[in-house]
Amino acid sequence: MLSITNVSYKYNDRQVLKSVSAEVHSGECLAIVGESGSGKSTLLKLIFGQMDVDSGAIIWNNQPILGPKNKLVVGHGFMKYVAQEFDLMPYTSVSENIGSYLSNFYPTEKKSRVQELVEVVELEGFENTKVQFLSGGQKQRVALARAIAKRPEIILLDEPFSHIDNFKKQSLRRNLFAYLKKNKIACVMATHDKDDVLAYADQMMVLHKGEVMRTDLPSAIYSNPEHPLIAAFFGEYSTIEGELYYAHQIVLTDKSSLKAVVKHSFYKGNYFLIEASLNEDVIYFKNPTAVEENSVVSLTLKR
């Protein structure tokens, strides 16, 4: 189990993290979300032992995670960290990069393992391609495969799908998180993408200016966001009479005392997002069809 207890960290007298606590068990995934600069990447670096905590403790299975003041070589054999900058070998092949941490004493097993990982990250056909010729998204997939090559006990992911296009992102998510769950690998992931969180995270931590705003099940936080910052993470929202409503919770109806003036209709594929003015406030709601601009509509609110 990963235990993070009251961890704080300062940089140049700026409080980057303050009293952060969390627990992650084997096979579980903790998703850390928040605005840029909220401390997500810093927390991952502290967990990895890349920096020293100012106070608090980080422990994995009763083993303290020490920073560079107490440990000369950064990192641990049981933990892998995939940062936003990929530390790959550009002049070697995809297979050589993925297998770089695997033993050469068992070449048959190594070859089989590399091919398994190539399939997990969907890079079939690129095994012999040098990394320097890959796209950013393909390099990110190589970095992910290399990180899980030796089946770590815990993996740290910093925006793991940020460079990957939508054509591959959905299936790659499914493959990777299924692999982590099957092999009981704990995961701590920093992300800006709600799709990383809702379907795959067991816990969700919201950081704001270095402090934990909330930690809970993703479904619980989504159902009751409590704060505009949290609601905004999940999509368009509106504040009506002091309450937060997602766009799908505001519904067009025939008659209602709640009336708004339509400003724009944005095509979203299987629905239109309608921007409207309600008592001088801007609100957003979903509708199957576009609505005429400047028309007055009646709305109802649904939870």
Regions from the PLM with identified roles:
Residues 48:
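Helix-to-loop junction immediately C-terminal to a conserved catalytic motif
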Residues 56-67:
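Conserved ABC transporter NBD signature motif
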Residues 65-80, 104:
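ABC ATPase NBD coupling module
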Residues 109-126, 178, 184:
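Conserved ABC ATPase "signature" region
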Residues 130-134, 138-140:
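Conserved ABC ATPase signature
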Residues 149-153:
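A short, proline-enriched helix->beta-strand linker immediately N-terminal to the Walker B motif
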Residues 209-210:
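Conserved ABC ATPase "signature" C-loop
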